[in-house]
């Protein structure tokens, strides 16, 4: 009889120690979610030039496996939620090599490059820039490399993201 009671208490003790506190895990997850949502608000390191229109002799062409943006086309890039990042090819032409080129995607600053007569590179797309829809890549050169200064070159090209099946 004592063995039965001891066995029952042992099983109860092991079961009690093995359980997890789901309430605290849920609170931790909620706190992490709200923190990550706060951090996901997009801010741009360099502001997008206001009221800028195409100017200068610079040209850009974006390329995907489906084609490129020549003649105003918007090449298609297939993506889904499993794609964390994808590369988008960009060809730059007729930019001033002594100036930095500020690259924006959907008016959010991505990177600064030194490009000249003919330069090929790629940028990494992730998060919002991989959501289905039409997206815009903008290359801008400023006087004295000051993003608040006069725009010397301003050119845009588009690409379209479609849901991968």
What do the predicted segments below correspond to?
Residues 6, 18-75:
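N-terminal, intrinsically disordered, polar/charged segments of Gram-positive cell-envelope systems
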Residues 13-16:
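C-terminal motif of bacterial Sec signal peptides marking the signal peptidase cleavage site
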Residues 1-4:
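Positively charged n-region of N-terminal signal peptides that target proteins for export
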Residues 127-134:
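Surface-exposed, short loops/turns at beta-strand junctions within beta-sandwich domains
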Residues 142-150:
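Short acidic/polar inter-strand loop motif in beta-rich domains
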Residues 68-115, 120, 124:
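Contiguous segments within soluble domain cores/interaction surfaces
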Residues 149-165:
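Short beta-strand elements
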């Amino acid at each position: 009889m004592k063995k039965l009671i001891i066995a029952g208490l042992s099983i109860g003790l092991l079961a009690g120690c093995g359980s997890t506190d789901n309430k605290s895990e849920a609170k931790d997850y909620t706190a992490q979610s709200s923190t990550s949502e706060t951090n996901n608000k997009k801010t741009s390191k360099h502001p997008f030039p206001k009221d800028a229109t195409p100017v200068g002799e610079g040209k850009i062409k974006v390329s995907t496996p489906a084609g490129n943006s020549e003649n105003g086309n918007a090449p298609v890039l297939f993506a889904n939620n499993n794609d964390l990042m994808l590369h988008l090819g960009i060809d730059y032409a007729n930019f001033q090599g002594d100036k930095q080129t500020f690259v924006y995607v959907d008016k959010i600053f991505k990177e600064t490059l030194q490009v000249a007569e003919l330069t090929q590179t790629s940028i990494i797309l992730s998060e919002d820039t991989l959501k289905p829809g039409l997206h815009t890549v903008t290359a801008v050169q400023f006087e004295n490399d000051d993003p608040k200064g006069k725009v010397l070159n301003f050119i845009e090209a588009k690409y379209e993201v479609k849901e991968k099946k």
